[in-house]
């Protein structure tokens, strides 16, 4: 306590924390007790190899600050708990404003706390590429989301699955106009309130609803995607690009609480990056397989993924599919192209000569598919930071194409509406300035009683439009399956009532 008071008196943030045994508590149960819709709360989880849950899960609650941006116009609401309309424009351009906020949220962390700490959590939408590249964008924006949004939680819960331990953490931010002891007392009170709610023996009653099974309505008219594929192939034939990823949106009614969709998705399609962001006005719910950029201890990491086969029903079928995948020249060529992109992207923010491919052409298993994966690392240059590393490789080649800038130009020309969160990044900044992010894939935007899912296919010279259309539908199908499972579960509860 004395150390925290001294830090606050010196104008430095402090982390007020406690830990408790959590062998009977789960992240989902805690989220059901604690998350309030639309407040900016979140749950982050991970599943490796489609079967092994990650060591740490993170819940963030009751933000005191919300940052959002549209293009170069950023705004911060520092009175979020009291007035959700109190956004004030930032005087700097968007990335400068975000960089200043990340710096202001830097804090010393007790070495006894896990590394999986967050101070700012949110997303970068695809259109934020316009902050670093001069690209025209479609004017149609049916979802109307901010280009980026980040929240700063006042309470964090970090579950350590290996140690059966729960860390309760309340950041205490300095205010030289206030007594540090009052700031610490408020942080302790927040922890007391959360601990009391966690101790409640009963979960909220199951959601009960008798609603029709959802089905998708495509945003594109029949045949329109095929026309987009044909136009892209003309650009490929002309030598403009080697590949471009063209996406489309599917929508379906969904009137259940967004967290019910997340509960189903994490079971049906577990992935390394699972997230439920219950943001003001909408929710982002996803199960992404692919890292976007990680910056930790001065090291940049990117992991290009390209090349896919379904999982087999047996170990022998898995091995046969793995062998087939690695022997496929088209899959290997596509992966090599994206691996080269990853090396180039990392190199733009790296110390000269530090880029390394530490794993190449490794097959990783996920819940329903297997992918070819490579790993690229580099030392962050002394004059660069995590945001530089993020936008050196933004957007990822796996959701844009190659060469990247020309592919993005063609995407803006051929896709009829803005992508929004899709193909951007979900992630968090840690108190030490680290960044962990994933590509927004297999993700739903839940807004106004509707789920919106975008999915794309990589278009190359020999692409067949009908096949690429089916690939988009199949990728979007994981979210639809989760929505149907959630509706079915709610219907069973209603029937049982």
Model-found features: residue ranges?
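Extended alpha-helical targeting/anchoring segments
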Residues: 1-497
């Amino acid at each position: 306590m004395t150390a925290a008071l001294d830090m606050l008196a010196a104008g430095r943030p402090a982390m007020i924390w406690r830990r408790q045994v959590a062998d009977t508590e789960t992240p989902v149960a805690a989220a059901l007790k604690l998350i309030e819709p639309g407040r900016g709360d979140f749950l982050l989880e991970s599943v490796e190899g489609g079967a092994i849950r990650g060591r740490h899960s993170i819940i963030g609650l009751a933000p005191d600050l919300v940052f959002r941006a549209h293009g170069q116009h950023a705004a911060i609401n520092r009175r979020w708990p009291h007035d959700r309309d109190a956004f004030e424009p930032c005087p700097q351009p968007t990335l400068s404003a975000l960089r200043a906020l990340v710096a202001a949220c830097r804090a010393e962390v007790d070495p006894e706390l896990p590394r999986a700490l967050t101070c700012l959590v949110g997303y970068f939408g695809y259109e934020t590429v316009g902050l670093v590249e001069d690209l025209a964008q479609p004017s149609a924006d049916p979802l109307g989301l901010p280009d980026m949004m980040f929240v700063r939680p006042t309470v964090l819960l970090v579950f350590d699955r290996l140690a059966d331990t729960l860390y309760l953490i309340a950041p205490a931010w300095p205010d030289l106009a206030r007594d540090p002891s009052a700031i610490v007392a408020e942080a302790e009170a927040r922890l007391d309130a959360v601990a009391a709610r966690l101790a409640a023996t009963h979960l909220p009653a199951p959601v009960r609803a008798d609603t029709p099974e959802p089905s998708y309505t495509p945003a594109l008219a029949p045949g329109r995607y095929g026309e987009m594929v044909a136009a892209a192939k003309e650009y490929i034939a002309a030598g403009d690009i080697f590949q471009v990823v063209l996406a489309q949106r599917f929508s379906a009614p969904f009137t259940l609480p967004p967290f019910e969709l997340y509960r189903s998705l994490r079971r049906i399609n577990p992935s390394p990056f699972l997230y439920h962001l219950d943001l003001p006005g909408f929710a982002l719910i996803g199960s992404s397989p692919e890292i976007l950029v990680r910056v930790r201890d001065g090291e940049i990491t990117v992991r290009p993924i390209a090349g896919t086969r379904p999982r087999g029903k047996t170990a022998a079928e898995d091995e046969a599919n793995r062998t087939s995948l690695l022997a496929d020249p088209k899959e290997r060529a596509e992966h090599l192209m994206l691996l080269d992109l990853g090396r180039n992207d990392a190199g733009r923010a790296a110390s000269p000569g530090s880029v390394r491919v530490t794993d190449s052409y490794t097959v990783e298993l996920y819940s329903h598919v297997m992918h070819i994966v490579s790993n690229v690392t580099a030392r962050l240059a002394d004059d660069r930071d995590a945001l530089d590393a993020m936008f050196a490789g933004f957007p990822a080649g796996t959701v844009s194409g190659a060469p990247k800038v020309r592919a993005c130009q063609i995407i803006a020309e051929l896709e009829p509406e803005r992508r929004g969160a899709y193909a951007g990044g979900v992630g968090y900044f840690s108190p030490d300035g680290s960044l962990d992010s994933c590509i927004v894939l297999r993700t739903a935007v839940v807004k106004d009683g509707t789920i919106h899912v975008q999915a794309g296919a990589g278009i190359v010279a020999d692409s067949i439009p009908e096949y690429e259309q089916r690939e988009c539908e199949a990728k979007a199908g994981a979210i639809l399956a989760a929505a149907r499972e959630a509706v079915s579960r709610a219907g069973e509860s209603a029937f049982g009532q």
